A protein has these predicted regions:
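Fe-S-dependent hydro-lyases/dehydratases of central metabolism
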Residues: 1-186
Length: 186
């Protein structure tokens, strides 16, 4: 049996150009990000979107932020669920609306920039820039330009970093636990 003190654990990022290149978000706090990317299969589940929306609620992103739901089901849930992962009631904002209000660019579900693609791919890095992303790989050229630097992080860390324009520990923006209801539970 292993016991972990989750309160003592720090959010991690993977520096370019390998998922194994681990560091804490705190140690990377001076890294400016030109773009934030939330989504694809790894960071595009409905719970990921709920976490990001709770960080971004009532705020505006500083770094251009691209959101790609991991499936059409997640996209539909983003439109129909509130920030607690429950069915949206009249007058409540949906996860989608919250992300949109924060200034995020929301695309269709799919891989999008996670695997680069042609120059017009949604969220693709077409020039050397620094991106913080919820995707699962950060090898040179993976999200587009071979000289782009991609940091991998959780949806919470990516959302917090989108707000500040630099890699940011999301605990600065979370004051209470984020509930996801039964969202994402099959």
């Amino acid at each position: 049996v292993h016991e972990w003190d989750l309160g003592a654990m720090e959010p991690l990022v993977a520096r370019p150009h390998s998922p194994d290149n681990k560091d804490t978000a705190h140690n990377c706090r001076d890294v400016k990000v030109d773009r934030a990317y939330i989504g694809s299969c790894t960071g595009g589940k409905i719970t990921d979107m709920i976490f990001a929306a709770n960080i971004l609620k009532g705020r505006r992103v500083k770094a251009p932020t691209f959101v790609v739901p991991g499936s059409t089901e997640v996209h539909a849930d983003m439109l129909n669920l509130n920030l607690k992962g429950e069915a949206k009631k009249p007058g409540e904002k949906s996860v989608y609306e919250t992300l949109q209000d924060a200034g995020c660019n929301i695309g269709p579900s799919g891989c999008a920039a996670c695997l680069g693609g042609p120059a017009d791919t949604f969220g693709r890095l077409n020039e050397p820039m620094t991106c913080i992303s919820t995707t699962n790989r950060n090898f040179p050229g993976r999200m587009g330009h071979k000289d782009a630097g991609v940091y991998l992080a959780s949806p919470l860390t990516v959302a917090a970093s989108a707000l500040t324009g630099k890699i940011t520990d999301p605990r600065e923006y979370v004051s209470e636990p984020i509930a996801t209801g039964s969202a994402g539970v099959a």
